[in-house]
């Protein structure tokens, strides 16, 4: 039996969501799943070409990437006819009380806004890298971190992502595929 065709689509501002998607792709490939990775900017396939689509989007200033919102709005019907998974990447998820789909305010707002019901949903904490941000982004993110009691200075990037949680999400998707 041929492995189901899995597409992984991401929207990333600073590259960390892409890194998470690449990790998911490796996990699924090790499980003999056939995957193709796309940036939302160059997704040129049809949703119906896939058995499963995994969509990942990061948060910037409290909002998910506009292109992901547009993609879901334009493809809602097609997405409802295949298996889907969605994950959000945001720094708020670094906090224990906001690191699950049930407690993360950005993910809850996103799902209400899109009215999309993926088969599997997850939230991952992102990366904080002041050195890579523009001056304006650095000031804004430092302000947000101050309000949320996070670090406002760091010479090195801080990766808050729980990579075991990413792995478990990938394995959960694989298990759902085997049941279908």
Regions found by a protein language model. Name each.
Residues 2-3, 27, 31, 36-38, ...:
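FMN-binding flavodoxin-like domain, especially the glycine-rich phosphate-binding loop
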Residues 2-29:
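N-terminal beta1-alpha1 ligand-phosphate binding loop
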Residues 12, 41, 90:
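Short beta-to-alpha linker loops that shape the active-site pocket of alpha/beta-hydrolase fold enzymes
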Residues 43-49:
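Short amphipathic alpha-helix with an adjacent loop that forms part of the alpha/beta core around
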Residues 44, 56-57:
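Short, charge-patterned binding micro-sites
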